[in-house]
Amino acid sequence: MKRLLLLTAALLFAAAASAQPLCCTKTGTELTYAQYDASGTRTGQTRTLVLSCEETDEGLKVYTTEEELDPSGTPTGNALSTSTLVRQNDMVLQLDEMLRGIDPSMLQGMTLGMGGDAYSIPFAMTPGEELPDIRLELKVSKEEQSLSFRINITDRKVLAREELETSAGRFPCIKLQEKFSFRFLFFSFASRRVAWYAPGIGLVREEELTKKGKLESSSELIAIRHADADEEPAAADAGEATAGAK
């Protein structure tokens, strides 16, 4: 009987995950994340606000803004506009629009552009599944000069379904990994990213690791505030990293 119940729960979760987008589509929702270094010390926070959702011919366009906060939660004055295209079976991160949303004062006269493959994440995924590689090209221009950087996102795999608990709540998640690498002239860089996404919420936790698998930094969802909420939930203590896979 216990085995049957566990199997039923797994099937229900799989059905729910395939039916819901792996991002928040409720206008007015605020998602607060804390960033930590390798030792678990909080280094900063970000607050993502869902500004609006707009139906288009391509799908649902979700517009958000990401505000940077210091470790105590005080705004630093830096913010970034982002958008995600939610289609029937996947979501596409609008990287080029994100670059255009960077405050011009931070670019020192440079313009940025992104081309290449769509950065998409499907909604229905199975542990062990491999996702297509992504090839991107970042173009940096200033006056009459320009440089292009090729970015490869490879080794994209669905690792597991896990339940993750943070100070924001408990979430059924799909766990993904991918490898980022780029090379320019004699300089190259590579890192790994592991991310947990929850249906209807989006990113719950992510970890950045060296190519050898050593943790460098992490980010975790610590509070959710809906548009009709009176008060924002209390965040976790500033010195702690609270999440863990259950």
Residue ranges and their predicted role:
Residues 6-9:
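Sec-dependent N-terminal signal peptides
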Residues 14-16:
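N-terminal signal peptide c-region/cleavage motif recognized by signal peptidases
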